[in-house]
Each structure stands twice: as structure tokens, then as C-alpha cells.
Amino acid sequence: MKKWLIALAGVLLTFTLAGCGSKTVASTSGGKITESQYYSSMKGTSSGKQVLQQMILNKVLEKDYGSKVSTKQVTKQYNTYKSQYGSSFSTVLSQNGLTTKTFKEQLRSNLLLKEAVKDKVKITDKALKKQWKSYEPKVTVQHILVAKSATADKVLDALKKDSSQANFTKLAKKYSTDTTTKNDGGKLSAFDNTNTSYSSKFLTAAFKLKNGEYTTSAVKTSNGYEIIRMIKNPGKGKMSDHTADLKKQIWDNDMSDSTVLQNVVSKVLKGGNVSIKDNDLKDILSSYLSTSSSSSSN
């Protein structure tokens, strides 16, 4: 299927298909290139067709779900990426042929598509139970990262005598090689089972800890040796207490599932009263409009 705005980079939405005519797009010593010539050339290419598909989908999504996606939401997601990439953010945008404006357009399109997924996909009890198996609530930990096993042993010996948060903080400042967190006692931002920043070994070890507990042996990861201490673990509790979180995680997974997205886009376009006026492009949505499928996470 075509990729519907689910990545940072993609086809830019600046190509305009409407209003093509005799206006000159470019001129050369060999003659002019008009909008109509440009349009005729582009509509026959895969990138040109992809842009039109995307524009059609965006129009329908805006009509159906535009009121559910605010500028504030787009800005919040934009700032998250900006913070993640730091000083290299502008370079990353440029390398992907994006500007602040076009990137925010993509983020908005992605949020609109997510609203469509939430609307069109039925989440079954079976799906909730399956997600519950891997679910872990957000926890807050502090950690000490060291390069050598001997150093880890030294830290663990000190913790055997005093495993308090104050002492762990002191040890983190002295030994940790994680320069971004050591001065704050190794404290990390809260995370749950959907976290992809830390290794599976790190996450597994962390989620096993109760408040005040620490890993009594170092966790070996690709970064070195990790010693983790739990600051706050609310406990998993009952599934019924976390239905909203479970649904959110399922929808997030659906956004990476091409089959689910295919079905959702098909439903959205079928309900969008789409009419293709150019005969050369009449079949551009055939793979979506000709299929009949049901969407459910089960």
C-alpha cells in the first residue's frame, strides 16, 4: 500500500494540482514550461500520484476529524521532536526536504489519521487482554551507568550498606558515565512498556523493582553496566483500571500496522464522496475504493 504520512519524511504537500493552465512555471532558452505541461508530466509519475492520493485523503480527514486535532497538539508533538533532536533538528528537517511548515502539516495529517483509526477500529476484549500481558504503568527510576564490571561491583558494595535515594544520588554523581543524568542523581523521565529508548534488558529489570529496591547485580547492556533503583512504581493493578492506557497503546500499534491502515483509509475514502475528474487518474484510488473490509484489533 501507499505510505500515508506515518514517518518523519515523506512526499511534500506543496505540489498543487488545481488551477493548472498556461502560467509559466519555468523558462529556458529552449522555451517555456507551463503549469499544464508540468501537471501532465507529474500526474504520470508515481510521486505525482502519491501526492494526489495524499491530498485527497487529507481533505477527507480534515472534514471528518479536523475538529479533533488542535494546533496545540501539533505544536506539542513538533516540540517533542525538536527537543529530541536538539541542535541538529534543523539539519534533520533539511535533509528530509522539510521545513517547519511542511513538517507540521505532516504531523497534523498523522494525528488526523490516528483519529480515523480510533474511530474506525473496534477494540475487542481479546485485544485488551493481549495488550495487558505486556502492559506496565509508567515508572520513575534512577540509574548509574559505568563502563567496567569492577566499577559496578564497587557501587553495589556501597549500596549494600546504604540503598537510600540520597546515597544512590551521591554514587551516581561520583561514578555514572551518563553525563545527562548523573548530576540529577541518575534520575530518568518516567517510562512505560512502550519505551523504545532503553534496551529490553534494562526495561525488564526496571519493571521488576518495587519502590526503593535496586538491581542487586549490574544489568549488562550495549552502553555498559547499569544499576537501577526504583523511585516510583505504582504497580500494575487491575486491567479495568487501565483500559484507557491499553486502548491508547493498541491504537499506537495500529498506526504502524499497514493492514489496519489500509482498511481504515479505505473506509475513510469510501465515506468521502471522492470523485476523480481527470480520466487519466480515475483509478488512482481503486485499491482502496474497490475493497470491502472490517477493521478490528483482536
Curated annotation (Swiss-Prot):
Where is this protein chiefly located? membrane
Lipid attachment points (N-palmitoyl cysteine): C20
The disulfides recorded in the entry are none
Record GO biological process:
protein folding
Topology class, membrane: Lipid-anchor
Catalytic activity of the protein:
[protein]-peptidylproline (omega=180) = [protein]-peptidylproline (omega=0)
Q: Where is the lipid attached (S-diacylglycerol cysteine)?
A: C20
Where in the cell is the protein located? Cell membrane
This protein's name? Foldase protein PrsA 1
Species assigned in the record: Lactiplantibacillus plantarum (strain ATCC BAA-793 / NCIMB 8826 / WCFS1)
The gene name on file is prsA1
